[in-house]
Amino acid sequence: MEAGHAVSSSLGRIAISSDAIAQIVGHTVPECYGVVGMAARGRVGRLLPLERLKQAITVGGGPEGLRIDLYVVVEYGLNLAEVAATIRSRVAYEVERLTGLTVAAVEVHVQDVRASG
């Protein structure tokens, strides 16, 4: 992950690490409706425990703002596009609210579907 992303004001500059942003995402995604868990990229069928959620999240930056990729497992029987849209919206809102940084894109990769419970 990148070393940091900056927010500047008249009082100075604040650097926010990609790991800190990934932690925000890691706390936000499991609370979204339809998410069973998160999975490491390319690892179908293996849910990650809370302490390893950063393996399911990639944070990058560009001139337009942050780009966040995340890998999820969605509950079977739900509309995947609707669940992904909810995740995108919620992640962008929480990251912008908590960091002051602009989120340019949130890419949701559905790694698997499974019954909840």
Model-predicted segments: where are they?
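Contiguous, often N-terminal, cationic amphipathic patches that form binding interfaces
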Residues: M1-L80, A85, L101-G117
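Hydrophobic alpha-helical segments of small multi-pass membrane proteins
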Residues: I87-R90
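Conserved amphipathic alpha-helical interaction elements at protein-protein interfaces in regulatory
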Residues: Y93, R97-L98
